[in-house]
């Protein structure tokens, strides 16, 4: 069972080395780490290239396309049987890949979402991301408020035939899209209350977690629902 890890990077030099080390130490010789760099202006690319590891496939964008499009590009390059998504600034616990590989081997499941420990500026603040965000497997719940956290997701490659291409529209995020599409097409989705990564919150990403205005949320949800409708009924 071949594993592909998909990652999008942008100015991630502060944390990227630790994250890549935590991933590569768990991958087999035939596994791969696909990284799409979205025109970083720091030394992120240099850090990645310094690993000199044949399992790393680095794709450098010539123009900035945004995180969703970058992740979509990494998924198109993935050839593993199981695909794991990764942020650039977390750290994987040392049993993550073996846990995921074994879980897919012995269970009839298409997509899993596992739990995470949370640190903020290096200090442990929570033992459960699930508890923090109120994670749930329900379809309508996730359309309203997303529980599909990309850095905690792994899924079978066959899901991609329904997932790709991911619409590049306001309010549509790659992880929510993958999870909700999987539910709509009746793939088996399981949430597992086992933390397998350390999810790192810091000043560079805390701003993206602020509560948004209802005047922003409503049009974003409409965009998502319309995109889901077009995919399911028109195949677009």
Regions found by a protein language model. Give the residues of each.
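Acidic helix N-cap motif at the loop->helix transition within catalytic regions
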Residues: 15-17, 42-50, 95
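Short beta-strand/loop segment that forms part of the nucleotide-sugar
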Residues: 31-39, 59-60
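Conserved donor NDP-sugar-binding/catalytic core segment of glycosyltransferases
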Residues: 97-126
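Conserved nucleotide-sugar donor-binding catalytic segment
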Residues: 138-210
